[in-house]
Regions:
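Eukaryotic helix-grip
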Residues: 2-212
Length: 212
């Protein structure tokens, strides 16, 4: 058995800064990489703080705390447990000719009251219905635009809430995701997508640290 075959599903730590562990999982057979991001945010123990982190309101927070990374987050359709979202990403790495990106995906929320957890399942709209994606792109004026899609192949975000005391709750995140970028990235940028995701949540975590 080759080294690649033996280690193809072994997580590799990419970045541990800020007590946030970003790991890469490579599949050498399909030449793909997915990521896991694990971290905890401690917040004042109020229903509003916990609700913002465990509901679709988290996207408002991510947009507000990531002006350098996110141009805009648009919620196209939303019910209590499902939303369709478009994230327009700021034009990063344009110096090497990469077009500005967007992600268009469906997010489904599942609440488990028994273990006080919430799980979000994310999937690119293109993988759900190609025509639906085209309809949304027309609505967003992204047809034939300067933006290119990042394909959100899959995402699973598990959030567990623990009441540490009367004053503080720990909100534990475990995020698995695979987002496909078609560009041929230089070696030093091969984990661009994973590090971009981490930076977004790093800024979110720092917001709550600063506010406490």
């Amino acid at each position: 058995m080759s080294y690649c075959e033996e280690n193809r599903f072994q997580p590799k730590l990419i970045c541990g800064k800020g007590d946030m562990l970003l790991s890469e999982i490579k599949n050498f057979n399909f030449n793909t990489r997915s990521y896991n991001l694990a971290f905890t945010i401690q917040v004042p123990n109020t229903n509003s703080n916990v609700a913002r982190l465990t509901g679709f309101e988290i996207y408002d927070l991510l947009e507000a705390q990531n002006k350098e990374l996110i141009e805009k987050i648009i919620i196209l359709d939303k019910t209590e447990n499902e939303a369709t979202l478009c994230i327009l990403i700021s034009h990063i790495a344009k110096e090497i000719g990469i077009k500005q990106k967007y992600m268009l995906f469906r997010s489904t929320k599942i609440l488990n009251k028994l273990n006080n957890s919430v799980t979000f399942y994310n999937k690119d709209v293109k993988l759900i219905c190609e025509q639906l994606k085209e309809d949304y792109l027309k609505q967003l004026n992204l047809i034939n635009s300067n933006y290119e899609a990042l394909i959100y192949n899959y995402g699973k975000t598990q959030i567990n809430v623990y009441n540490d005391s009367n004053d503080v709750s720990s909100v534990k995140f475990n995020i698995d995701f695979q987002v496909i970028i078609d560009d041929d990235l230089p070696l030093y940028m091969e984990n661009l997508v994973g590090l971009m995701f981490k930076k977004m949540f790093y800024n979110l975590k720092n917001y709550f640290i600063s506010a406490s």
